């Protein structure tokens, strides 16, 4: 997956820009799309708003940050967007909302981040988690950010997005399927370039190993 962003820093903690992301979809014969998305963010002393995520810092110092957060879970499925006749018989899956905690430890050794969130929009009430380590490397105007991590999703969330119910199996001809808990390791690399005092640009790639 990759993303590009250009942002203009405003006063009072505000920033704005435009970004885009693209990722191969795990659904069979599915149309993958990338759309430009305007982004707005605000960084206050305690409250922040970063695109589809809102947070409030409970602890914030040079070495550690702990926040309570609510954000969009950016996964969905539209049966009509699949070219496979059987998959087109499945029910749609919508975006979800999740809420929980984000934690981040930082120092000269890099940054260690962790999160745990629960789905609250009526899509099974599943739990997701993430643990990752990153080490920013400064080279002139460019900052490289390699990251290694692992994501967790429980059976309830996986079943909503990837399961095949008995009713769906009956009308599609697919086998009924109920996934379990999953761990998904990933690697990513991002590069951020400071163009001038007001503008910066960022691009990144990420690879994940999906569970069977």
Question: Which role fits each region the language model picked out?
Answer:
Residues 14-22, 53, 68-72, 114-118, ...:
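Transmembrane beta-barrel strands of outer-membrane/channel proteins
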Residues 57, 120-212:
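Outer-membrane beta-barrel transmembrane domain signature
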Residues 40-45, 59, 104-108, 136-138, ...:
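Structural signature of outer-membrane beta-barrel channels/translocons
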Residues 14, 46-49, 64, 109-112, ...:
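Repeated loop/turn-to-beta-strand initiation elements of outer-membrane beta-barrel proteins
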Residues 24-26, 85-89, 115-120, 172-177:
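Extracellular loop and loop/strand-boundary signature of outer-membrane beta-barrel proteins
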Residues 12, 32-38, 62, 93-99, ...:
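Residues that define the transmembrane beta-barrel architecture of outer-membrane proteins
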Residues 3-49, 54:
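Short glycine/proline- and aromatic-enriched beta-strand/turn motifs that initiate or cap beta-hairpins
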Residues 28-32, 78-84, 116, 125-129, ...:
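Outer-membrane beta-barrel translocator domains and adjoining extracellular loop/strand segments
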């Amino acid at each position: 997956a990759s993303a590009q962003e250009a942002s203009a820093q405003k006063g009072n903690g505000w920033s704005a820009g435009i970004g885009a992301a693209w990722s191969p979809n795990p659904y069979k014969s599915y149309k993958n799309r990338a759309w430009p998305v305007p982004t707005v963010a605000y960084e206050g002393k305690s409250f922040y708003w970063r695109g589809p995520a809102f947070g409030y810092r409970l602890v914030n110092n040079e070495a550690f940050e702990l926040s309570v957060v609510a954000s969009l879970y950016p996964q969905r499925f539209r049966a009509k967007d699949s070219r496979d006749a059987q998959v087109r018989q499945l029910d749609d899956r919508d975006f979800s909302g999740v809420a929980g905690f984000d934690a981040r430890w930082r120092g000269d050794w890099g940054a260690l981040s962790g999160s745990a969130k629960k789905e609250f929009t009526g899509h099974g009430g599943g739990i997701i988690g993430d643990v990752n380590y990153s080490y920013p490397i400064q080279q002139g105007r460019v900052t490289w950010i390699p990251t290694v991590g692992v994501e967790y999703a429980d059976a309830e969330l996986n079943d909503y997005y990837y399961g095949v119910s008995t009713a769906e199996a009956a009308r599609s001809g697919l086998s009924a399927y109920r996934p379990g808990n999953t761990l998904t390791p990933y690697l990513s690399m991002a590069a951020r370039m400071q163009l001038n005092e007001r503008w910066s640009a960022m691009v990144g790639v990420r690879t994940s190993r999906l569970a069977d």
